């Protein structure tokens, strides 16, 4: 089966799928291929007319050597997951080419279809296919393939491989009829190999050093919160500098609901008094609220500027930036304090905490997502490595 005349693709096509354990603890993805306690329970593949399933480590290693030595085109759905497992069994991505049916669909749909499931893609191509509901529910419940009846698993895996092969044939026909897109599609498949290898290699991370730095940042955060609360204690109803609504009200003013004690009135309209006990003679009260007006910290000129330019008057980072640029006095200092506090918070919760939580043996293995954004931009998760910058020393 010759896919492209430029020699990039080989004639040997192998469609595969792996079923694995689900043993990685939170916050990791349970079936994470880079978590050391997970492994392949079964590997199903189709090569020409041959369909087979492998269960032993030795047979999977032999399979990996075979597809690498003979430079196969490996086909799968959400293929990076399978490749990451196979790399642990010795697969060298330099020796194979790949075709991800999910990635191809994402490209061919104009990036409208994101991370579609195998079932959704089969439906799109009008292929009869339905996953076993019982097995799907067990996977969702955190039960790995090693905890599922092997005969049921065998049927489940065989069905997945067959429909993936059928989808590939449909996509291959489309590919051959879209000459203008062929080079781009091949480049995108290659990019998937690159990011899969990036995930596998990971990034070394000093966990103990990060934990110490996180402690220091957390202490600094507490000190800053107390300092801001003390400095701005005279602002009406401002008690929590981490509350966006309180920050917005302090800056822009407005009506706030304030808890008050309300006298309980009898049927005659007179206050009801306690008839006995320690409070005898005192007026009974109940909890209520009154609306109070808070005056804005920002100047009227700044309010007019925001209104004229259509800017949102809130506590967003953009609003705080504009206030620091165009206002003066207390409003600027207040905005600076809140911005500084948020920066410390972000450093802890965006960098230190997730990086520490996701590190395995001093290495972070992020997931790079190809099929999420409508712009085609790559995204990253578990953890999000794209938030890194050169302004923060980690």
Which positions does each model-derived feature cover?
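Active-site-proximal helix-loop-helix substrate-binding element of RNase H-like nuclease domains
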Residues: 35-66, 72-175, 276
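Cytochrome P450 core scaffold surrounding the K-helix E-X-X-R motif
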Residues: 23-27, 54-56
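Conserved "right-hand" nucleotidyltransferase catalytic core of DNA-directed polymerases
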Residues: 1-24, 35, 42, 129, ...
